[in-house]
A protein has these predicted regions:
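TPR-adjacent "capping" and linker segments in tetratricopeptide-repeat scaffold/adaptor proteins
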Residues: 2-19, 77-88
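Alpha-helical segment of the N-proximal tetratricopeptide repeat
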Residues: 13-41, 45, 91-101, 107
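Residue-level recognition of tetratricopeptide repeat
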Residues: 16, 49-51, 118-122
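TPR repeat positional signature
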Residues: 20, 53, 89, 123-126
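Specific register positions within alpha-helical solenoid repeats of the TPR/Sel1-like families, i.e.
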Residues: 26-29, 54, 59-63, 97-98, ...
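Canonical positions in the second alpha-helix
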Residues: 41-42, 75-79, 111-112
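Structural marker of alpha-solenoid helical repeat scaffolds
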Residues: 45, 79-82, 115-116
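Asp-box/WD-like beta-propeller blade repeats and closely related beta-sheet repeat scaffolds
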Residues: 106-111, 116-131
């Protein structure tokens, strides 16, 4: 199984999807340009890569594109079957925050990070003024 930059297992079988996901992940977490493009390329390489859709949803959310974020979240949900428990929990955290359920999102993020402390994309939700503590 392929892993991301932080060593988390990814439900994708293509190195190209993983590589683009990692580029998007690092761009997103460092607030640099290119996250949306990289996550989009990851989805093009593997249309069943749930985490790439979630990265895209988060990128859209951060740029104020809420309708696009909801569409990407819906696509992630459609391809969740067969993913890991971490990826399903990752989806839940994103779904809660994107639907405005901040208290539930905060609790879900704490649980997720307790179970998977190397999942920086989710940990970031509670560690930034642009996240749940802002």
């Amino acid at each position: 199984m392929l892993t991301d930059f932080y060593g988390n297992h990814l439900t994708t079988s293509t190195g190209l999807a993983r590589d683009n996901y990692d580029i998007g992940l690092r761009a997103f977490l460092s607030a640099n340009y290119g996250a949306q493009e990289a996550f989009s390329q990851a989805v093009e390489a593997d249309p069943n890569f749930s985490l790439a859709y979630l990265g895209l949803a988060r990128s859209f959310m951060n740029s104020g594109q809420s309708e696009e974020a909801k569409k990407a979240l819906g696509k992630a949900k459609n391809v969740l079957k067969g993913t890991t428990e971490r990826e399903k929990s990752h989806f839940l955290c994103c779904e809660l925050i994107l639907s405005g359920q901040t208290q539930k999102a905060r609790a879900a993020v704490y649980k997720h990070v307790s179970d998977w402390p190397r999942d920086a994309m989710i940990a970031q939700m509670n560690t930034s003024v642009f996240g749940l503590i802002g």
